Amino acid sequence: MKISEEEVRHVAALSKLSFSESETTEFATTLSKIVDMVELLNEVDTTGVAITTTMADKKNIMRADIAEAGVDRKLLFQNVPEKENHFIKVPAILDDGGDA
């Protein structure tokens, strides 16, 4: 299955990524090869092969719910370049810079 450069640009725009024309061409080629390789799996005869739903025998392994001391805020904020109202200030990632 051929992935077009237009499809790469569309997914990049949805992901808020930008690529040069050469990168777009390279991604289209690479993604096409990956999809072709995955499509080869459809040709494998799996008759009689048990369904594999997980590779691990254990399920729902969780740690004990024990309260632990967190990181000291003063120590944490020593290396923070920008802070505002006791929060770490980071660059906006939304177009209008508003709330999510």
UniProtKB/Swiss-Prot annotation:
The keyword Nucleotide-binding applies. Its EC number is 6.3.5.-. Keywords: ATP-binding, Ligase, Nucleotide-binding, Protein biosynthesis. InterPro entries: Asp/Glu-ADT_sf_sub_c, GatC. GO terms for biological process: glutaminyl-tRNAGln biosynthesis via transamidation; regulation of translational fidelity; translation. HAMAP family: GatC (MF_00122). Allows the formation of correctly charged Asn-tRNA(Asn) or Gln-tRNA(Gln) through the transamidation of misacylated Asp-tRNA(Asn) or Glu-tRNA(Gln) in organisms which lack either or both of asparaginyl-tRNA or glutaminyl-tRNA synthetases. The reaction takes place in the presence of glutamine and ATP through an activated phospho-Asp-tRNA(Asn) or phospho-Glu-tRNA(Gln). PANTHER family: GLUTAMYL-TRNA(GLN) AMIDOTRANSFERASE SUBUNIT C, MITOCHONDRIAL. This is Aspartyl/glutamyl-tRNA(Asn/Gln) amidotransferase subunit C.
